[in-house]
Curated annotation (Swiss-Prot):
Pfam families: Oxidored_q6 (PF01058)
Enzyme Commission (EC) number: 7.1.1.-
Keyword Iron: yes
PROSITE patterns the record matches: COMPLEX1_20K (PS01150)
Oligomeric and partner information: NDH-1 can be composed of about 15 different subunits; different subcomplexes with different compositions have been identified which probably have different functions.
Enzyme class: translocase
Subcellular location: Cellular thylakoid membrane
Name of the molecule in the record: NAD(P)H-quinone oxidoreductase subunit K
HAMAP family reported in the protein's UniProt record: NDH1_NuoB
Physiological role: NDH-1 shuttles electrons from an unknown electron donor, via FMN and iron-sulfur (Fe-S) centers, to quinones in the respiratory and/or the photosynthetic chain. The immediate electron acceptor for the enzyme in this species is believed to be plastoquinone. Couples the redox reaction to proton translocation, and thus conserves the redox energy in a proton gradient. Cyanobacterial NDH-1 also plays a role in inorganic carbon-concentration.
Residue segments, region Disordered: 220-241
Entry superkingdom: Bacteria
Reactions performed catalytically: a plastoquinone + NADH + (n+1) H(+)(in) = a plastoquinol + NAD(+) + n H(+)(out); a plastoquinone + NADPH + (n+1) H(+)(in) = a plastoquinol + NADP(+) + n H(+)(out)
């Protein structure tokens, strides 16, 4: 080291060698040290990256959604955690045909989900009934006749990339919501399901059906004889001869 350098110059050389960026200086500006936000933005920011879907797949559209679980698409990066119980889910993905007999079960699952909750109608069969509604009287022609739908995803079936696009659009909707205006969209009434209570009723098996004409035993004289059998006496006489 050059002995002609002053101690101050030597100190500056050492600081520049050990820490080229220099010592960080804390600014006194308020905007550089405090994050200002609203309660709506903070609440929505926490929810839009933690959507927990309930997968309600009934037909071939669900196969495309199952492809998202693999490593090629990896839907976990969006914070999607599939749930098997509606009480821990806030997103209902309906994929496939919904029949009249299945409609009360779907509505009951939707009612068991806590607020706020969202619904994605995936596929043509879910949105309009699809090809199964052409000749069938039991297919529901649009799941929005049963439950409110937040996002429609057309296709037969939709590609996994389209499902990603639907999730991104739903995240934008969640990010623009307001806590004060949420009561306008909350569910205030039940849909087509009734109270699931067990009531004691009288037995319907009273035996009256046995008195019907169709339940009576047909006599042997009224039965149609297919083959005329010979009498037993005739058989014995032929054996003796």
């Amino acid at each position: 080291m050059n002995p002609q350098l002053s101690p101050k110059a030597i100190r500056e050389i050492r600081e520049g060698t050990c820490n080229p960026l220099g010592a960080p200086q804390v600014t006194t500006d308020l905007s550089e040290n405090i994050i200002l936000t609203s309660l709506d933005d903070l609440h929505n920011w926490a929810r839009l990256s933690s959507l927990w879907p309930l997968l309600y797949g009934t037909a071939c559209c669900f196969i495309e959604f199952a492809a998202l679980i693999g490593s090629r698409f990896d839907f976990d990066r969006f914070g999607l955690v599939p749930r098997s119980s509606p009480r821990q889910a806030d997103l209902l993905i309906v994929a496939g045909t919904v029949t009249m007999k299945m409609a009360p079960a779907l509505v009951r699952l939707y009612e068991q989900m806590p607020e706020p909750k969202y619904v994605i109608a995936m596929g043509a069969c879910t949105i309009t009934g699809g090809m199964f509604s052409a000749d069938s009287t039991t297919a529901v022609r649009g799941v929005d006749k049963l439950i409110p739908v937040d996002l429609y995803l057309p296709g037969c079936p939709p590609r996994p990339e389209a499902i990603f696009d639907a999730v991104i659009k739903l995240r934008k909707k969640v990010g623009n919501e307001s806590i004060l205006e949420r009561k306008k969209t909350e569910q205030t009434h039940r849909y087509i399901t009734s109270d699931h209570e067990m009531n004691l009723v009288f037995s319907e098996n009273t035996g009256e059906y046995l008195n019907k004409t169709s339940a009576k035993v047909i006599s042997s004289s009224q039965k149609e004889k297919i083959t005329e059998l010979p009498e037993k006496t005739e058989i014995t006489n032929t054996e003796k001869d």
